[in-house]
């Protein structure tokens, strides 16, 4: 025996000695920049005692002489024949060796260098190498946002966590980018991360369209290391409660002869966890693969919720009947889904929420079968392991399910052998079945079925590897269960076939793209290898083993998934105390780690998950493991037909000198091709059939728009006439007429009740709908902070006021343990007893408001509660406030309580409602909300600008008149505000001007919805920054101003990107075609903003390229879709329009040349330069003709000067411009001249006297003068004419700092900043100003000492009583500016400029309050909506559109509202038109202030803007204002309509105002008042007697002629006149007529006798005087009668300059008795007493 073993050993040694020595080279197939690369080197078959030395390094294959990494030496021998080395490509080496220039097929070569290769192996070179894929990807970046969903205009807070390849914190520089829903990059920031955590925020532009935004981050030097997170942007409000639909089974089994009964549960719970009581309305439908929805008729159900739940059953018979109506059978359902929609109306407040179930599939089996872990390669003669995963249709593992396998083994020349095996799945739904494989196998066919009697079936065919190979290696796994971290995995290695002779198996373990371990194991009959699974091997790894047989490697591999467990470190969040908390309470949050770590925290309202898409989930460990596994280079479960295939599939690169793996082409694995069967289900539904007639998406959209109803009456023909695209008009008209005929048939059938509601519901579902909106006014997230935690820490947190469930997230970052995401902690915040209060956005003084707080009692006891409104100044309340109502609130129910309130003071009043329980049950709650109370009438603004020049003696004293507007409301207590500055540059461009917190956008009182208006966020701030940079004056402003300026610019950049098209052009509205003018405007500004916004130069180059496409053959530019129809931005006519546009684009293209820095853009740059030259020729030709108007001449001169056009062209343009200049004193400006349409504007010269205010010029004059100033500065620098033009421009600025509109403001600030840069001086000059006035509070004086280095004057102190003269004295040696702003409310609009523009607003509809103040909702029962299963329920229990209206309006993003009986709904009609002789400068805006307490239905406004027959370009809602944008105002009357809803009852509603104005010339406007519908409850009295009495406390009381109670008093009239209140006037007047003025009544009278006067020195008999009284007061003076009126002087004057008088509680009003009455015996004495008073008071007055 000993001899036999010796022979065998000698034989094997002899065989080994005959094998060829070689060097094996292993590496991951991808090299990552800056990341260690594990490299395996091994000697194979070298003679005993052989030592081999060498080195490995990386190099560029095309530049062999430059290494890309440092060299690493190795020494190998026959005894130590392998080594695992580490290489790295540093960034500096990657650049020096040229790797960053490898744009196509970036490869790097792994090289082993050893003299042994040439000396011992007779190679031609001492180099052996292999090509690897090069990637700049490295490390891990994880991103986190504070919410999964945001409203437009909301702030997004986010974090970036940086880790290296080993999941340890990385301090590096990263680049963060934000993309909007169109995929356009709107923000880019590069930051260094010293703590490995970066936190930042940004604001989503409020004009953003709904969609998914993305934040991505990468290491700045690693372009491929990109990581991202997404969040949803849409308009939403948080749900009050959440609805869930849970099917009884997660599938519906449909096989021939079998159909499951369909059962489901509906659950509704408030966000704070309590069940909802109410009614569920459920509908069913079908969803196909494309998400197309069709509803079943007749399957609707309505049922009560009991304890927040309801059970619904749908029988097989009912369902089949519904299918037959669609001409479908059960066999047609495969692959479709049953759609379920549930609408829940909760009983206490009638609020509605909805839910959908879209994942209920019709299936042929209740299981799915996954064979992806089964290898696609087999080893002949070794067991083949079938690995299957069985899941239920819900996605959860199916345990204990029988799996049957039929394995057919085919071998050449023999009958196929069939093996039938059955095994049940384990607890994780998996099964591992070994199949015996003969050595002669050619093919293995597997048929696998799971479950019974309706199994899931899968088939798999595995071909045997080619025969004649060197043998096979089998890797067998005794335990097929996935190991956990900390387990030891045992594997068996066995060589199969070919009698292989070798001494050792070599094996490697690869994880996360690296070789983490390399070893060898001596060959035995059954060789076992143990692998310890640590954190480095999670979440998966490849085990690769091989040996050599002769000159051929034999290999196999196995992918091992590690059970996803916790993170490497530890982070646990926990809270002390109860499961339930109260709002405002403190809670202790415990943070526990196992090492020093940074812990990032965040808390959000779980209602956000209900409001947003289910796909946007917070960061968790599953996502972390997924990111870690993304570095895995292996593809598939392992194995291969050859060793090279095995290595490649495991992600290895290999070379032994004779054979090698091919270089990898991409990071990802090749994807399997999948096909999806398409179904064409024949849905027999009228509208769907109609839609199906149109093939193109555009035509279908037009058809859908035609089907949609408008909120106003229009015929289909009228609507179609507004559709601009001809190819859209036909389908729109056809579908509109078709839908109208369907509606008519439906009306003719007289459908009513629920069935009619269902018809409309189904019709509404044809329309593309937004997601369901819901309500909230509370913080949606908090606790956004990072804490340093050393193993344990306790934080004390104070919970917000929301009643909801908060979810607290935590993520830790440790230097030793890496990243860990904790399991979130949920905090339920709830009060068993609480109240809910709604308030309107605003009300006006003396309107009447009904508060209806709702009390919720979730206790199991009835509560007697005391409710009151706390007293507050400015509100009339019952009992003066504090008077409580006693209310019984039964257990588990809610009850509303009514309070009437009348506001009497204009202010923001904090209104507090308090509810308290009894002594036995001391519960309570209080809610405080701010009620905004406005003054009556409409706001009117008036501005005056004065130049202060102490060097001119005529301007050293000024008198600012105090004249008041006769329309001003009589008791407004208004002020004049004065602003003084000695530094116009810093005042206009500093922290109080362009760099103020809101930027210039806050300085213009204009909306900002369209593309051009958006630029106001950006352009002026750039001008200000440029001025402050050039003059080095940032230090004169607050320290944070520069950061704020950059932030403003970045916000503006984000906003304008919402209007960008894919070709680089821009449009005024998101739905419009591109505009040449707007695109040029954006190009100019963004080219200047490149440094601040970090935008892509390529994007701006695309914009320049698009502009070139708009140039005509003669050099001019065209605008296929002007931003506005205003004859090219300035009221120009004829030739001026084309010239001005060409000049404007030329200026933009010139500025855009700055972005052409890279060599690749040189050809386009040359085209741009040629285009500019061509345009200059066109401009020069037109200027030479001498026919241009002032605006075209100015912009042409500037364009030619800026682009350095030929001197002869410049000279002509300059002379033409200067010939049009107008000079008055020290002012130079350009106004209306021949050729300009603005001749219609009256000339506005400069002031004739230095003490006169500067007349305010129209926007076009400002813009023209600004272009002229820009030209002068380039043409001759800071000379006299530039001084004069800048002086005129400076004085045209408004009180806030802007000018008239967007364009003139942008250009004026651009010109002034350029001038101020040129004229900047460090010389300090002073200005002394004294202002004095005598007003309501006596004499007031201010002395100011200013200098030209100060930011601003003390304008916050400079307030003077409106109507009082202000005297100004000026001294010093510096010029300055004084601006006066007067803001007051007016009674009517009769003096507005409604000659050119006209607007009319009418309101129809009335309010019906059907709910009594003491009505309650016992046990949340909803008796008006009986359950379907109630046998006593009437057939049609629902008002026809009650459910539908709630659903439709909420579908359109409306806030929840109570049911229709509680709503106050009106219909608005807004009509506009203009004088046909007057042209507009373009876009017009109708600003409609809604009646108090109302908000417009967004659904109606969206229909006006979003359909093909667009009526309004855009709309905005700001508080009580609705802004409607019109492209133009027609000469004939055009009307639009929408509905508005008043959620909180308001009585005695006062008229509101509406204004139509020209956006580019806001002075051209028309303003009107409109009122509530007559005979409407809106005009009714809501207050209780006591509150009414309080509200009327300031009203005058009419003394009836000869009242008996007063006759007994001696001298009662004289006491009133002379003692208290001591009147200031006394007249006997005759009333001529009564007139309504906003919230007042005006009585026009004629004086018959003057008894007394103070201020009214011109009062005399037969003169006219006006008396005013509030419309809310009862006083009515009858025309034709005479009255004795005494009282206090008024603050306002009529049109003749005579005082007007307000009648109030300090007024005496007494009707004069007739002569006939005085002749009666009974009244003779009283009349004598009255006549005595008139005689005595009229002649002697008061004797005190």
Curated annotation (Swiss-Prot):
One Pfam family cited in the UniProt record for this chain: A2M_BRD
Keyword Transport among record annotations: no
Tissue specificity remark: Complement component C4 is expressed at highest levels in the liver, at moderate levels in the adrenal cortex, adrenal medulla, thyroid gland, and the kidney, and at lowest levels in the heart, ovary, small intestine, thymus, pancreas and spleen. The extra-hepatic sites of expression may be important for the local protection and inflammatory response.
SUPFAM superfamilies attached to this UniProt entry: Alpha-macroglobulin receptor domain, Anaphylotoxins (complement system), Terpenoid cyclases/Protein prenyltransferases, TIMP-like
Impact when changing residue 1286 to A: In allotype C4A1, allotype C4A3a, allotype C4A6
Keywords associated with the record: Blood group antigen, Cell projection, Cleavage on pair of basic residues, Complement pathway, Disease variant, Disulfide bond, Glycoprotein, Immunity, Inflammatory response, Innate immunity, Phosphoprotein, Secreted, Signal, Sulfation, Synapse, Systemic lupus erythematosus, Thioester bond
Positions bearing Sulfotyrosine: 1417, 1420, 1422
A GO CC annotation given for this chain: plasma membrane
Keyword GTP-binding attached: no
Stated consequence of mutating residue 1176 to S: In allotype C4A1
UniProt modification remark: Prior to secretion, the single-chain precursor is enzymatically cleaved by plasminogen (PLG) to yield non-identical chains alpha, beta and gamma. During activation of the complement systems, the alpha chain is cleaved into C4a and C4b by different proteases depending on the complement pathway: C4b stays linked to the beta and gamma chains, while C4a is released in the plasma. The alpha chain is cleaved by C1S to generate C4a and C4b following activation by the classical complement system. N- and O-glycosylated. O-glycosylated with a core 1 or possibly core 8 glycan.
Modified residues (Phosphoserine): 918
Quaternary structure and interacting proteins, as annotated: Complement circulates in blood as a disulfide-linked trimer of an alpha, beta and gamma chain.
Biological role stated in the UniProt entry: Precursor of non-enzymatic components of the classical, lectin and GZMK complement pathways, which consist in a cascade of proteins that leads to phagocytosis and breakdown of pathogens and signaling that strengthens the adaptive immune system.
PANTHER family given in the database record: COMPLEMENT C4-A-RELATED, MACROGLOBULIN / COMPLEMENT
Protein name, per record: Complement C4-A
Organism from which the protein derives: Homo sapiens (Human)
